[in-house]
């Protein structure tokens, strides 16, 4: 009896989640009157017959095409479309008139943490003492 109640509760939760009316998915039938109990296979067959489930199967024609770029397209010159954020650079622009600082080419002069990120420069005085 407890397993029957838990099966009905599970079915009710699934139906409530997907928004299907209960009578459409599993019609209420008294098991004593017909001599048969509706098993899980009958419920699966009823579920597969639904049009929404058939559309979401892989290989169906109802699949939506995804856009390749998260940026909205913008009309450019000559009617061509280009993504809005394609022209933006990921680099931080240097302020105008500022002198560019040259980066250290020798990476062995930096301290590295356990994640492979550098966090400071090694000092020559410590290396000579140590």
UniProtKB/Swiss-Prot annotation:
Residues 110-119 are annotated as: Essential for receptor binding and receptor activation. GO terms for biological process: decidualization; G protein-coupled receptor signaling pathway. InterPro entries: Metastasis-suppressor_KiSS-1. The modification Phosphotyrosine is found at residue 110. Residues 1-19 form the signal peptide. The modification Tyrosine amide is found at residue 119. The keyword Signal applies. Residues 49-82 are annotated as: Disordered. GO terms for cellular component: extracellular region. It is found in: Secreted. Weak in all tissue types with highest levels in lung and 15- 17-day embryos. Expressed in areas of the hypothalamus implicated in the neuroendocrine regulation of gonadotropin secretion, including the anteroventral periventricular nucleus, the periventricular nucleus, and the arcuate nucleus. Metastasis suppressor protein. May regulate events downstream of cell-matrix adhesion, perhaps involving cytoskeletal reorganization. Generates a C-terminally amidated peptide, metastin which functions as the endogenous ligand of the G-protein coupled receptor GPR54. Activation of the receptor inhibits cell proliferation and cell migration, key characteristics of tumor metastasis. The receptor is also essential for normal gonadotropin-released hormone physiology and for puberty. This is Metastasis-suppressor KiSS-1. The gene is Kiss1.
